[in-house]
A protein has these predicted regions:
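A solvent-exposed, acidic/Ser-Thr-rich amphipathic alpha-helical stretch
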Residues: 31-83
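Short, low-complexity N-terminal intrinsically disordered segments enriched in polar/charged residues
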Residues: 1-30, 36, 154-163
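Soluble or luminal CAZymes and related metallo-dependent hydrolases
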Residues: 14, 55, 100
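A beta-strand edge to alpha-helix "cap/lid" segment located at domain peripheries
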Residues: 2-3, 64, 78-163
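Hydrophobic pocket/interface hotspot
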Residues: 22, 34-35, 42, 56, ...
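Hydrophobic alpha-helical core bundles mediating ligand binding, dimerization, or RNAP-core interactions
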Residues: 19, 23, 38, 60, ...
């Protein structure tokens, strides 16, 4: 497990280092360290989840546990004090066994040296056709499938957190 101490100040370079640290922990599937990168009042959103607080750490725990074959490449950028990341996980989707290469862009906001807001954006149709096959290809652009996937993801997270 990587050791982690919150950074001393809120300078952008420290924020960039925190995000590099977050994704390096993800590469190691070190969900406990990842959770420590987030403020207790943090907010996270992507195409499948809208989470806050401890739910974020639980999501990373679930994804690390289920993503046994996951590999990850990432880059972190800083422009005008704004920190963004581009990351590309490759993994077998646990529900279908299908290979997924997702391309994600992330934006971050910080409070007290930790992530307070994390927004991930990716092309849901591209993801759904890889993860789900024909149903994703045909319906991945519709709100119907997007909502179904989000509901299923949240149900899985709630069950995971109850363990």
């Amino acid at each position: 497990m990587l050791s982690y101490t919150p950074l001393a100040n809120n300078e952008p370079s420290d924020h960039k280092a925190l995000i590099v640290y977050l994704y390096n922990a993800f590469k190691q599937k070190d969900y406990a360290t990842m959770a420590k990168c987030y403020h207790s009042d943090a907010y996270f959103r992507d195409e499948a989840f809208e989470l806050s607080g401890k739910e974020i750490g639980a999501m990373w725990h679930m994804l690390c546990q289920r993503g046994k074959d996951m590999t990850l490449e990432f880059s972190v950028s800083e422009q005008a004090g704004n920190i963004t990341a581009h990351w590309e996980p490759k993994y077998s989707f646990s529900q279908t066994g299908r290979f997924v290469h997702n391309i994600i862009d992330a934006e971050f906001e910080f409070k007290d040296g930790l992530v307070i807001k994390h927004i991930d954006r990716f092309n849901f149709w591209n993801w759904s056709r890889q993860a789900l096959g024909a149903p994703g290809l045909l319906l991945g652009w519709t709100p119907l499938l997007r909502n179904k996937v989000a509901k299923m993801a949240m149900t899985n997270l709630v069950k995971f957190m109850e363990k």
